[in-house]
Amino acid sequence: MAQSYKLFTSCLWQTTSAVVSTEHRLYLFDPAYFPHEIETIAEYVQSERNGRELILVLTHGDWDHVVGVGKFPDASIIAQKEILTDGRIEKKLNKAKRFDGSYYVIRSYEVGMPKFTKLVEDAQDWQEVFFLPVPGHTPDQMATLFREQKLLVVGDMLSNLEFPFIDDSGAYLESLEKIERLVLQGEVEEVIPGHGVPAKGREEILHRIERDRQYLLDARAVVFEGIANNVEEEVVSEQFSQLTYDGVSIDEHLRSSHDQNRDQLFKEAISQKG
């Protein structure tokens, strides 16, 4: 399969910004992060556009993924509708501004509220793509499938760099199943995650799906069973700290994210117990 996209990778968390070319449109995903990096993306878009409509898709509303929108004022902006729930995107934009302020980052454009052209509710075909809500990391996360290229841009999941960061573990498992079905049906041959390098080929994609699913199942088992059996929180937390990802101990630099997953699962388990 000939590569039909250009991938830009920020030095901040290896955040990816994909530009996917189709006959009538240019699709830009999550332009990130620092001004010089976004300027490079903008120059590429300008050189490749050739009169085509520019579609800017936000895979989700986390601050490192939305900060570059203002650099592309004539783009049609698309996101999943949950991005507007409970002032979510406003909070994330403010977080981006605080980050920039802390490191004296100056931008040539305003980091402001995007003007959305389309808000996606359910899975749907649109033009030459298929939008698929994949909540779990965030409520508003959305994957985009380019059917002809068999290319799936997923946002913050299926990364080679990190285990699942959980907002809703049940929804996350369901989202993995949605993507797995697409792969098994032969509709996806390459996945671009929000951080890290793409997964190419059925075997690699399914491996990433399975290791993420196993982490979620193991994590849920420790916490949900512990809460159901009235095990002391300290004991459950100690068991949780011993969990592995893909057979390897959790990296120290990701330990805080692992702990945040534990806290989220405690909330879910307590809510389920009632």
Summary of predicted features, one role per range:
Residues F34-H36, G61-V67, L84-D86, P139-Q141, ...:
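Active-site environment of divalent metal-dependent phosphoester hydrolases
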Residues Y33, K91, F163-D167, E204-I205:
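Short, solvent-exposed loop/turn segments at secondary-structure boundaries
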Residues V19, E121-F146:
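Core dinuclear metal-dependent hydrolase active-site scaffold
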Residues F29-A32, E53-D64, I78-K81, P133-G136, ...:
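Active-site neighborhood of phospho(di)ester-bond hydrolases with catalytic His/Asp-centered motifs
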Residues L173-V235:
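Divalent-metal (often Zn2+) His-rich catalytic cores of metallo-beta-lactamase-fold enzymes
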Residues I38-E39, E43-D122:
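Active-site HxH/HxHxD metal-binding segment of metal-dependent hydrolases
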Residues E225-G274:
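C-terminal regulatory/interaction regions
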